[in-house]
Amino acid sequence: MRRFLFILLTCLAMTTSVVAVNRVHGYVRAENGDLMPYVDVSIPAENWYTLTDTLGGYEVLTDKDSVWVEFSHVGYKTERKFFTFSDKKRSDRRMDLFLREDTQNLADVNVQGGRLQHTMSQALDITKLEVMPTASVGGIESLVKTFQGVSSNNELSTQYSVRGGSYDENSVYVNGIEVYRPYLVRTGEQEGLSFVNPDLAGNVQFSAGGFDAKYGDKLSSVLEITYRKPYRFEAGVGGSFMGATAYIGSSNEKYSQIHGFRYKNASWLLGTLQTSGEYDPNFLDYQTYITYKPHEKVELAFLANLSQNTYNFKPQTRSTIFGTMGDLQNFTVYFSGKEQDRFRTAFGALSAVYKPTDRWKLGLTVSAFYTDERISYDIEGEYWLNKVYSVDGMMGEQTGVGNYYEHARNQMNSLVIKAAHDGSVKLTENNTLSWGVDFTQEMVDETIGEWEMRDSSGYSVPYQSTNPSLYYSLQSSNHLNEYRIRGYVQDEYRWHLRKGGIMSFNAGVRFNYWSFNNEVTVSPRLVIAYFPDIKPDIRFRFATGLYYQSPGYKEIKDTVTIDGQLTTYLNKDIKSQRSLQFIAGMDYYYNFLRHPFKLSVEVYYKHLNNINPYAVDNMKITYMGRNDAHGYAAGLDVKLFGEMVPGVDSWLGFSLMRTMESVIGTDNKYVPRPTDQLYNVSLFFQDYIPGLPQYRVHVLFNWAQGLPVRAPGAMQSSSNLRTPDYRRVDLGISRVFEKGKDPWMGRGFFKPFRQILVAFEVLNLFGFNNVNSYYWVSTIASDAQYAVPNYLTGRQFNLKLQFKF
């Protein structure tokens, strides 16, 4: 495999056209000399933009021989600079400039896209992923989990909960195309790599609610990634104890390409779990993004992904001590058997964009997603449950003994084909109308065959004196072949108020029709933003709307018992879950001890109807398959972003949240939803050694309330048990070597490299035993069930290397 990747990268490098890339860089200051962070820097002719960093620094790369660069900020006059370059060699220009306050003509202020947060989306700086210590292989989701309102109690998974929503309530878009994840994944160990490849990503936006009408039919969040077009030849390789990555890209005036490879093997990390055995998880992924401009008004693009995830596991032993100091128990298991899982996915999208004028933009996209998933296991375990009389582990009397046998043969094939059109027209300088419509065909074939037998002291559980029965058995076969028609229209308008400031409105409506249940939903949405001229360092926003989540395949499965056998059928009476949302927020930019900071605060309330109740076991979500509940979610999210030490970004997030539901038949009693967490604190802190700023320390901290738990067979309303608080600290130490700063980088073996990153990480620094779920042990001697905790990963070390050409 390594030889194959090397040959492929070499061939691609030899066949690409390398063009000279010109660079303009410098700092932006106010008239009083203060550095200005978050200034919009754009090339209007190329629809390219960025922001100055927290020190006011910027960098512009272009392959053109001349370019206009625009600098703009609310409350300041827009500056436009023209640069010309030699077409024979690369040029490097330094340009520092000052922005003047604009006290009269606010029309010069350029407010576009998400640069000034007039929507509910926030930009993510994906460069932090290179140094952020995480248990994943550089997934963008690791960065998302540090945002306010986002929670994840499993470092092995890329899934997250946003403001009390389930893992299935989050949309992910790549270049405007919605992407999907495997259906049958039950644990974080199986999950592997997410779809998004950070090496290919350019602009990343995340919204925790109140998003525009153009985004799909989910209730909680939107993660939007735009894959970039390289300006020049570029390449990079990286590796760690948990995997490897590689990418290569190039471009010329009409053509651009970028390819990415990822490999992950988490056996190094899974070895810290309490169940010892032979872990062999292998995850491989290839992606490409290619663009071609046959005409200055037309651009074609192709996005593709191929991935294969295999998870092979042969458990051997497990020993877990749990309980309180007055009632310690030891759960010991000896295993035989194995698990073999395979997930294969393929995705392709071909799009065309036509811009007849500067005001009009028309797009057409055809895409397809295919997944082939297999889960197979036969695992037998013999267990003993003993009292523990001391923390040293001295065993006492035996409280339970038995064995169990778990069997599964589950498979699923799914094909999703979509044709979509979108467009926009700039009616005036301050008014843009956009729209879109798509037709989606969904085909799913699923066969489930799984059962579990338990034997306690020679008796099957549940105990029956005459006919021994299985503890759990599910057999089903379902087929789905339906279509969806969806569309939206929205208008974005802004104007300059007479008394100063800018007001921005984004009003739209979205509709959805699904042939499976013949349901039509209409979703009106509104986002308002205000940028006061009197106080330009404060910005306000408000969003409201009626949001629907059209059921997915997992949500329409209703479980019933027929002749003592559990099975599932597809419930055609299912309706979309509905959420009426109100969100208000503000951003405050300020300097403290000459360091720039940004404070963001949002409060929200979501009234939930037609809830489809569900239960969570590890990462597996099982829906009731009926709209049998109503509820609410309310909370406060706070994030402080800035330089706690000069020149290095850090941020602190804090959330208070409560989400409750009332299920039909429970006397209108409200109980916590499966993702209810009262508090969640996250911190990403960076520092460096005084006098040696190139040596940096990175700390990722998370502390969240435990999730509600219920025993198998218990009503959801009786749930009063929670997992312990989730606590985790990951530590990283890094050193970046750069050409031009480190003299030896331009010599010998290191001459081809532009940058080298070396990082050492300690994952789960303090060795916290975080509980992911519980295994419930039943005994014949008593009716009690023992909740044996399933712990997540322990302390582990990791070394990362990254080379950029």
What is each of the regions a protein language model found here?
Residues V19-D108:
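Periplasm-facing N-terminal accessory domains of Gram-negative outer-membrane beta-barrel systems
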Residues G75-K77, S86-D87, R93, L116-N170, ...:
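Periplasmic N-terminal accessory/gating domains of Gram-negative outer-membrane beta-barrel systems
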Residues G236, S240-Y263, S276-Q316, E339-A368:
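Transmembrane beta-barrel wall of Gram-negative outer-membrane proteins
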Residues K293-N309, K338-N517, S600-V603, W651:
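Face-selective signature of the C-terminal outer-membrane beta-barrel domain
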Residues K361-S367, D573-N627, Y632, L757-E761:
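Membrane-embedded beta-barrel scaffold of Gram-negative outer-membrane proteins
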Residues L497-K499, Y605-H607, M624-A711, Q802:
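Gram-negative outer-membrane beta-barrel transporters
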Residues I534-F582, V603-Y623, L700-A714, N769-S773:
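Surface-exposed extracellular loop regions of Gram-negative outer-membrane beta-barrel proteins
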Residues S650, N702-P712, R735-F805:
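C-terminal beta-signal and adjacent terminal beta-strands/loops
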